[in-house]
Amino acid sequence: LMAAFENKEDVYIAMASTIFGEQEISVAQRFVGKTTILGAGYSMGAKKFKAQLAAMANIDINEKEAKRIIDTYRRKYPMIPTLWKSADKILSAICNDRYTEFGRNNILKVEGRKGICLPNGFYISYPNLRYKPTTGNYVYDKKLGRQIVESNVYGGKVIENICQALAKIIIGYQLLMISKKYKVAMTVH
């Protein structure tokens, strides 16, 4: 996947081509490729993938086809599921209040219950993180309006949170640099 980005390929078309076994890709097929890259990259499963296609583009596929597509992604990019598994170790370290390092050149530090320390000194935290042996899942307390709700967290979600946090740091830095010369009005995602 990194090579595709480096070569400035349209990774959505490349994924769709792998999924459908075709070189000429329609707009709808590219959307399937895009949804696969963006969702499966953070460990989206077949059920959610099927629902996402239906909700966002009125594309109806059966669960068997959704599973085939998700499995195709995981076979094409086996290092990504390996990354999710390594991120599960982050959850274990937080839950057990242990220090560990993560990422290329160990750029991210996990400081026990404090969470994942980002390069700018901010933290990604999962309040009251705990492991539920009955389900085999990690859960944490998430604020939803005025309520606190239990929310699942897993390796793929941790990777998504890290990617979003690092992107925010980069955009913030760029805004500071731009603001030295121009007035910043807003950002668009």
Where are these regions (language model features)?
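Conserved catalytic core of nucleotide polymerization and phosphodiester-bond processing enzymes
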Residues: L1-H189
